[in-house]
Amino acid sequence: MNEDLIVEQFEQIVSKVAQELPRTRIYVLAVKPSISRLHVWDAARSVSARFSAIAELNPMVTFIDSASPFLDSSGSVMGDIFVGDNLHLNEMGNEIWGATIKAGLMPAEIRFEY
């Protein structure tokens, strides 16, 4: 996983959207952990932290921590939220993901409603 490339491309997207559609809000999710990709989890956490830092500096970008809800109390990836490939979410995983995104999206959007 090339962290710098991923973040650079995200920054380019943010810049392009700001230039061409300046009132457009951008929501970026943390990289989702998975058992099948534990070998890149440290890099994924780093990318997520950098996405969060970008959002802190740009009022049109909101970071949603969609990774933490998939971790157990010890910080390990939960095992019962994936289908057999240990990458894609099962029904319970998708429910967690959807609720997490909604919880991050709704408060961020409400400030633009008034």
Task: For the regions a language model picked out, list residue spans one by one.
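Alpha-helical cap/lid subdomain in secreted, periplasmic
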Residues: M1-Y114
